[in-house]
């Protein structure tokens, strides 16, 4: 199946390269025209082909998986009209990250945090609770690894776009395996892992890789995707986690239609 990753501004480059490393056939579309030359060179090095415009889909055949951010200002109909004969599957960036990480994290507790306010403070309260488990953290304050109580800054200036969950995991891998050749897939180190838990803050929903999804609140249900969607609709993805902790006011107002066996409200 062909994969088309839309939006190379908010983590699409990482998603494209990660899919390519898994042997997928990947195309990418820089909808905002912000692709940096270094990122373009990386995509070219991995064999990711860039589309000039969605009208290029007219030359495609068969199945096509569209991977898009939840704030994309295009509907599925607006995309598929470029070639109505294709068999489309649509995945959010969040869902794509979960698929990319399908073989990661089964043996450790993982918490994903989303919401309008209180995400970062919730992450660091959870860090204090889980500190004995050497948590790996992605938050708006950076990608951080805690090892025996010692804070290791992996990257300071990193956004909480879902693709940076994979980036944070990769950064921690490099710390644990300094002599490995990741790009070639040849590991010379011992493939050690320095963390025993993970806490990931994510904007506009969660990937579903977490054992627990925490929704702090919907204090403001702002519009996204050029008013075609809202914050509450995007953050509905929290219910993809097997266990969910959701602020009761948010649940009652926006998600009362959701039946989830692992739901707890607060």
Model-derived features with residue positions:
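Acidic, Mg2+-coordinating active-site environments of NTP-dependent enzymes
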Residues: 187-201, 205-266
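Short, basic phosphate-binding NTP loop
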Residues: 1-112
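Conserved nucleotide-sensing/catalytic segment adjacent to the nucleotide-binding pocket
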Residues: 149-211, 215
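Short, hydrophobic beta-strand segments that form beta-sheet elements in well-ordered domains
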Residues: 5, 25-30, 50-51, 65-68, ...
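Walker A (P-loop) phosphate-binding motif
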Residues: 97-143, 149-150
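Residues in the short beta-alpha loop(s) of Rossmann-like NAD(P)-binding domains
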Residues: 32-34, 141, 250
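Active-site regions of enzymes building and remodeling cell-envelope glycoconjugates
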Residues: 23-26, 39-53, 80-91, 135, ...
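Flexible, charged surface loops at secondary-structure boundaries
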Residues: 1, 20-21, 44-45, 57-64, ...
């Amino acid at each position: 199946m062909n994969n088309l990753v839309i939006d190379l501004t908010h983590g699409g480059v990482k998603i494209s390269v990660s899919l390519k490393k898994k042997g997928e056939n990947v195309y990418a579309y820089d909808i905002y025209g912000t692709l940096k030359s270094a990122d373009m060179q990386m995509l070219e090095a991995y064999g990711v082909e860039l589309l000039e415009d969605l009208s290029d889909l007219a030359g495609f055949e068969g199945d096509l998986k569209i991977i898009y951010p939840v704030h994309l200002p295009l509907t599925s109909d607006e995309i598929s009209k470029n070639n109505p004969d294709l068999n489309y599957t649509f995945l959010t960036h969040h869902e794509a990250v979960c698929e990319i990480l399908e073989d990661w994290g089964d043996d450790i507790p993982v918490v994903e945090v989303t919401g309008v306010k209180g995400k970062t403070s919730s992450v660091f309260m959870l860090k204090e609770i889980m500190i004995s488990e050497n948590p790996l953290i992605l938050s708006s304050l950076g990608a951080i690894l805690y090892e025996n109580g010692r804070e290791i800054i992996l990257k300071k200036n990193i956004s909480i776009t879902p693709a940076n969950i994979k980036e944070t995991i990769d950064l921690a891998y490099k710390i644990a395996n300094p002599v490995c050749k990741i790009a070639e897939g040849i590991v010379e180190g011992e493939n050690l892992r320095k963390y025993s838990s993970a806490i990931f803050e994510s904007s506009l929903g969660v990937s579903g890789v977490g054992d627990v999804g925490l929704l702090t609140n919907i204090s403001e249900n702002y519009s996204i995707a050029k008013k075609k969607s809202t914050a509450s609709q995007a953050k509905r993805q929290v219910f993809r986690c097997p266990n969910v902790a959701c602020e009761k006011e948010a649940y009652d107002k926006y998600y009362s239609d959701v039946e989830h066996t692992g739901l707890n409200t607060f």
